[in-house]
Amino acid sequence: MADNLVIVESPAKAKTIEKYLGKKYKVIASMGHVRDLPRSQMGVDTEDNYEPKYITIRGKGPVVKELKKHAKKAKNVFLASDPDREGEAIAWHLSKILELEDSKENRVVFNEITKDAVKESFKNPREIEMNLVDAQQARRILDRLVGYNISPVLWKKVKKGLSAGRVQSVALRLVIDRENEIRNFKPEEYWIIEGEFRYKKSKFNAKFLHYKNKPFKLKTKKDIEKITAALDGDQFEITNVTKKEKTRNPANPFTTSTLQQEAARKLNFKARKTMMVAQQLYEGIDLKKQGTIGLITYMRTDSTRISDTAKAEAKQYITDKYGESYTSKRKASGKQGDQDAHEAIRPSSTMRTPDDMKSFLTKDQYRLYKLIWERFVASQMAPAILDTVSLDITQGDIKFRANGQTIKFKGFMTLYVETKDDIDSEKENKLPKLEQGDKVTATQIEPAQHYTQPPPRYTEARLVKTLEELKIGRPSTYAPTIDTIQKRNYVKLESKRFVPTELGEIVHEQVKEYFPEIIDVEFTVNMETLLDKIAEGDITWRKVIDGFFSSFKQDVERAEEEMEKIEIKDEPAGEDCEVCGSPMVIKMGRYGKFMACSNFPDCRNTKAIVKSIGVKCPKCNDGDVVERKSKKNRVFYGCSKYPECDFISWDKPIGRDCPKCNQYLVENKKGKTTQVICSNCDYKEAAQK
């Protein structure tokens, strides 16, 4: 029997660590939190200094029993949950359930799950850091007080199943504020003039810049006519050439927020998926002969700091692969996170390259690991050097300008370039070699009318970035917050951008009217600052809670008395119930919209909303192929005659048969291209854009 018991959150993490520690250690998983506030009641005594009432989470009884059995037999119990506030709280709850000594040095933390890091952490166990626990408790109790007081009011006055929360309500506000900006936006006319110029055999483009040596706004067609009237023929002169060398530094290694943003843009991953895959990489991958190893450092962090050991290893790799000139000469600029002395997200070893790891990883694991690895290695590489040139092209009072750039030294761009929501500006644009006084010919002068555009709706990446910039929430809260406002049907995705629903706007208006603090950005930011102060030991958690609740409970009382009941009318479905003849209406359920009888509860008939794709079922040739959604919201195709016909396909049938085997053809999407393939054999048609 092992003398030492180690408790971690997950079986995957337990399996990895046990291999490192040897036979004297037994490592078991708590399966996350074992204690929490009860779901059936508030669980916070507002009359007794906000004392929380923690209970064993439903279904965790057998886990707790197993933990107690092993703890009783062990000489030493070590708590090795994750190295953040949440992990510290899990360790504290475990110590209470197992009745461990408060002053016992039994807490071990490591930022990466590698043999050296884990063994080193066990040489330096410490006491549970109660300031971190209290910061987590304060957040949990705050969220419980808000949710359990506002939600019943919304259920009573608006609709059952609604919720509001400190972070989710601000996230919803951001989406709605942006939508209102778009609705209120008044487009303004403007024009641009682009010219195509020729010098010898080279052609290049330039834009109108000045009229009579001053900026001249092209607001209307009259302005255009004024400029075109001033032009005299097609001959222009180069009146100024400005050459500069520009340095572009690599982006810092990932934080939680920047990882979620970049994975959304480059890999099309949702925030929740990014965190799930990152957790797998952190907790350990079976590398066969090398054993199970955590491939990345802890993935919930707001720090860009890198350890000296990791920097040295990256420098060695870069020197060997690219040469000394590609290594960074800059001093470290990484920021320390607000939550503890974490590092940025990086590979646990630069020497474990994505290509070497590919055979051990799933497709998603490989893509995310490659992104993390390349971003980190690039962050330790030399800047890129760009040669820029600006040409002023003049005729009389009219001046055009052409800007060009070429890459002189690629540096980090050899490996990795950060993407943006908008078009990146790092593309090469070569201009012919021209000197002041050279003559060029205009081959085309083209005015174009434009209108100003409203601000774009939020993508998931942009919403995460905005939440981080405003200091709303923490690395661990971004993904669940975005998930919640979608599950509650407060927002929906259209073309990968968030649009508020009618329900979302109704809930927002009520929260805005009766609980203004909850959606106030400054209030939410100040609360995060107070939580940080609790973690640093500068203020007690009870004082923070009391400062909030004393005014909040008055808002709750006012809302209960004054908020008017709002009736949300169901959308007509346009057909009658086949059971009782009453009109069918469209309802919103857990997995999206569905049809239900308006005569509920007397009639409980429901139907899925199906969308025909205009193709006959290839199996029965009687029903139509309709688009449906799985419980995980994935689109699939079935027969309208179901259950009589059980045809099903993940790919969209196109209504034609394969010329090779006569089975049905489908559209198969791979990234940004769509291919027509056979559902049965290897027949393929050319990819379509």
From Swiss-Prot:
It comes from the Bacteria. Residues 129-557 form the Topo IA-type catalytic domain. A zinc finger (C4-type) spans 577-603, 617-645, 658-681. This is DNA topoisomerase 1. It is an enzyme of class 5 (isomerase). Its EC number is 5.6.2.1. The record marks 33, 139-140, 143, 148, 155, 300, 488 as: Interaction with DNA. Monomer. Releases the supercoiling and torsional tension of DNA, which is introduced during the DNA replication and transcription, by transiently cleaving and rejoining one strand of the DNA duplex. Introduces a single-strand break via transesterification at a target site in duplex DNA. The scissile phosphodiester is attacked by the catalytic tyrosine of the enzyme, resulting in the formation of a DNA-(5'-phosphotyrosyl)-enzyme intermediate and the expulsion of a 3'-OH DNA strand. The free DNA strand then undergoes passage around the unbroken strand, thus removing DNA supercoils. One of its GO terms (molecular function) is DNA binding. It comes from Staphylococcus aureus (strain bovine RF122 / ET3-1). Residues 3-113 form the Toprim domain. Mg(2+) binds at residues 9, 82. The active site is at 298 (o-(5'-phospho-dna)-tyrosine intermediate). It catalyses: ATP-independent breakage of single-stranded DNA, followed by passage and rejoining. Pfam families: Topoisom_bac, Toprim, Zn_ribbon_Top1. Keywords: DNA-binding, Isomerase, Magnesium, Metal-binding, Repeat, Topoisomerase, Zinc, Zinc-finger. CDD domains: TOP1Ac, TOPRIM_TopoIA_TopoI. The gene is topA. Residues 328-357 are annotated as: Disordered. Disulfide bonds: none annotated. GO terms for cellular component: chromosome. The keyword Iron does not apply. Residues 163-168 are annotated as: Interaction with DNA. Its cofactor is Mg(2+). GO terms for biological process: DNA topological change. Belongs to the type IA topoisomerase family. The keyword Metal-binding applies.
